[in-house]
Curated annotation (Swiss-Prot):
Binds 2 manganese ions per subunit. One of its GO terms (cellular component) is cytosol. Substrate binds at residues 125, 155-156, 187, 193, 263-266, 336. It catalyses: (2R)-2-phosphoglycerate = (2R)-3-phosphoglycerate. Its EC number is 5.4.2.12. One of its GO terms (biological process) is glucose catabolic process. This is 2,3-bisphosphoglycerate-independent phosphoglycerate mutase. The keyword Manganese applies.
Amino acid sequence: MSVSKKPMVLVILDGYGYREEQQDNAILNAKTPVMDALWAKRPHTLIDASGLEVGLPDRQMGNSEVGHVNLGAGRIVYQDLTRLDVEIKERTFFANPVLTNAVDQAKNAGKAVHIMGLLSAGGVHSHEDHIMAMVELAAERGAEKIYLHAFLDGRDTPPRSAEASLKKFEDKFAAQGKGRVASIVGRYYAMDRDNRWDRVEKAYDLMTLAQGEFQADTAVAGLQAAYARDENDEFVKATVIRAEGQADAAMEDGDTLIFMNFRADRAREITRAFVNADFDGFARKKVVNLNFVMLTEYAADIKTTVAYPPASLANTFGEWMAKNDKTQLRISETEKYAHVTFFFNGGVEEPFAGEERILINSPKVATYDLQPEMSSAELTEKLVAAIESGKYDTIICNYPNGDMVGHTGVMEAAIKAVEALDNCIDQVTKAVESVGGQLLITADHGNAEQMRDPATGQAHTAHTNLPVPLIYVGEKNVKAVEGGKLSDIAPTMLSLMGMEIPQEMTGKPLFIVE
């Protein structure tokens, strides 16, 4: 009979940041006796989850992808956002062979260059400065037909903030004398990640057929009409932008399409609709043979050109566990499953030897304020069973509630989400203690602790750049170290497990055994 393992458990409370002011703070306004007691009685510290400490530009808010890559890597990983900023600043972006070839191919054949992406200064999935650089690259290389298909944000940015961005691009096209905004649509449609293909189809038809529910002469006019219909940026319905006498911007065989999002999870579905010959998410009314370029690799099985292929990370936490013959479990709901697997493993899709995965379906609701507890009860049940099973050396779990409900901007719902989590943490803590295991509770970035923007008074639906908690529960007598960051978590776990830390991990343990 094999000896029961005492697991090292990492619970990531997504979007659960630390802020001392109670005003508009869903976490401090919720009843959280369990987390309050843990914070009061257990070793704890605050860690950085944003900006330079996670490889993002200074003061840039953290996000789930970046957070999990840093958590699993045990070193600061410079993100695509920072990498692209540097490339554009140093002008190497304008010589990227994949991008220049794609533009030249269309130009030489008299075809159009279509550029699509999330038009946002949020910096989570994309950055409008990168899209602007792509517009400049296309114009500089002599492309005549340049069409921008703008996905609108309102989630990583204030709910109604797209007008300034659209105006900037309309001014740019006017100044350079070629190109235009061809369509606008909310990210709710274009950037789904939960197989809601009816949404994706609307965005796909808008771009391929130049057909939408609405039409406007200019992008700004189209946006203002959406606001008049009470649609915030995220939910703007498919709108064709075409003034009297302007050519149709429908996509044709031989056109180039460059997708300027750098984050993978919400880029995959629409990319597959364009690229996969055997795509079956919906019946495509028009299949276009495009020269399709992904800015970064959205998935290894999407067979199309990549402008910036991934840099590989050696000896992430998951790989190091496998090399040391340890068993590990990754568990979350649909919304954050990719984060505890693909992102935590440094962009590796395949599970490592000894790595098991459990996926709990997120509830099928339009927005999560309608079900703030999400699937946390089922997730907790499965997590507790895994802790008690004695099968795993380590377990990584993500609870999405703080982030997914925080994104809705609905304070009452976010409070309910936090209260549901407190009950879950109670069960998890008891299970870990009953088997003599160890538990770290932390977050990947903030969100629910700031539900209203103090400057604008609008709902605050974006992440924050505030620190996140880190709490230790276990039998070891440990002392917390100040000044930590997300990339210190993997070394902390290895140290608590009594394991060697690989040299590639430059993070430091945040709990020292006394």
